[in-house]
Amino acid sequence: MTTPVHGFVLGKFMPPHAGHMYLCDFAAGLCDQLTILVCSLEREPIPGKLRHEWMSALYPDARVLHFDRDVPQEPSESPDFWDIWRELVRSVHPEPIHRVFASEDYGLRLAQELGAEFWPADPERACRLVSGTQIRQAPM
């Protein structure tokens, strides 16, 4: 019997867009169990609870979790940034994570911190040139 491959994606999903869906679809196709962690801060313009609901509806076969503690968002914000995020992820996902999927540079370091493989998904944005910031600035 083979061990199921656990995949992991995290993001703000503010709002979920085609790039996020590409990433999650890519990840879902390369693991047996996918966990999506929706991270939010109280001060953000779209409530985290709503984003969690959206991602849960989009990915009913994934385990979609929500984390809403105020923690550093960039390594420059805290010398303990990677320790904080490693423990945060382990607190919500105590099972081993085998693969971390991301389109951003942080994915490699996060995978290393978790003892997982890094699987980059379209890092050059060749498949989906989408920005959540641009969507929030001009939603229609």
Predicted regions mapped to residue ranges:
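Nucleotidyltransferase catalytic core that binds NTPs
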Residues: 1-140
